[in-house]
Amino acid sequence: MTARIVSTFGVAGLLRLKSFSGEYAHLATLKQVCLAPPRSRSSGTLACALPREAVHMVEHVLLRAQDALLKLHRVDTVECARTFVGAELRVPRAEACPLSAGEFYLADLCRCELVFEGSAVGVVLSVVEGGGSSLLEVQRTHGGVCYVPFHRTFIGDVDVGRKKIELLQRWILE
């Protein structure tokens, strides 16, 4: 996931994007994008009308100070554009925002093993937007799903290469 369509803009079918990384420059050269309904059941209050994931051709992207405007081919009215609000914009990793040393994409946390004091206690299913921090949706080893704030109070070392995330406070799984 690179961005989310948060609203329409104007009457000509423009879509306002909010980048998950906060970076927008890499969006300017996109020729096509994959748009999909939000992955997680808990991805916020935006209701996306897209029935399934699909590839769309990009006419242009206008970068602004705090967001970007996306114009898709054949999306020429605000009514048509509204069906995309809430959708997630996905691009090939090569076209995503470049990472600095020690950084990772939130999507890389999915399927990582959550480990407490050397023992596996769960697997990350998805990353959900939360108020103060993102939340890891975790399938607990002994059953059930819970949410763990992705915050230094609860999360220690993250090794996406080994697919391991250190949990610092076990009680948060209860």
UniProtKB/Swiss-Prot annotation:
Localization, UniProt: Cytoplasm
Keywords, sorted A to Z: Chaperone, Cytoplasm, Ribosome biogenesis, rRNA processing
Keyword hit for rRNA processing: yes
UniProt keyword Coiled coil, yes or no: no
Disulfide pattern: none
Pfam family, one: RimM
One MF term in the entry's GO annotations: ribosome binding
SUPFAM superfamilies documented for this protein: PRC-barrel domain, Translation proteins
Cited InterPro entries: PRC_barrel-like_sf (IPR011033), PRC_RimM (IPR056792), RimM (IPR011961), RimM_N (IPR002676), RimM_N_sf (IPR036976), Transl_B-barrel_sf (IPR009000)
GO biological process entries: ribosomal small subunit biogenesis; rRNA processing
Domain PRC barrel positions: 101-174
Cellular component terms (Gene Ontology): cytoplasm; ribosome
Entry's free-text remark on domains: The PRC barrel domain binds ribosomal protein uS19.
Quaternary structure and partners: Binds ribosomal protein uS19.
Function recorded in the entry: An accessory protein needed during the final step in the assembly of 30S ribosomal subunit, possibly for assembly of the head region. Essential for efficient processing of 16S rRNA. May be needed both before and after RbfA during the maturation of 16S rRNA. It has affinity for free ribosomal 30S subunits but not for 70S ribosomes.
Annotated family: Belongs to the RimM family.
Name by which UniProt lists this protein: Ribosome maturation factor RimM
Gene: rimM
